[in-house]
Amino acid sequence: MMPKVISLRPLKDFYDLDVYPSKDITVMELGASSTLLKQEILQSDGIILPAVGSKLDSSLFEGSKIKLIQVTGAGFDRLNVAELSALGIPVANIPGGSASAVSEYVVSVALSLLRNLNYCTKSII
């Protein structure tokens, strides 16, 4: 039987980057609020989880055969990693994936504040 992975991130996000799953894996796209989520978790081997969204209760994973939860960002805010560890489920993230974007944002906001650009915009409007 092929491993089954649930993606709570739209598969289109991956396809747009020319990233496709192996033919040896079944990937099912679900929304975090799907009524099928608990049922599918019990039958799946892994989950791809976007970094942004509502928290997922650890009880969803009790009795599951999940071998890995992969977060597609740096943070673990959506999960209780300690509770998942107690269930034997490792959680992985992608630290530094958006570091350059964050640094660019910080520099642009700092320049905006130094140049009073937000006040200029208000006076134009």
Question: Which residues make up each language-model segment?
Answer:
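An N-terminal-biased, well-structured beta-alpha scaffold segment characteristic
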Residues: M2-P90
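Phosphate-binding beta-alpha-beta segment of Rossmann-like dinucleotide-binding domains, i.e.
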Residues: L87-I89, P95-I125
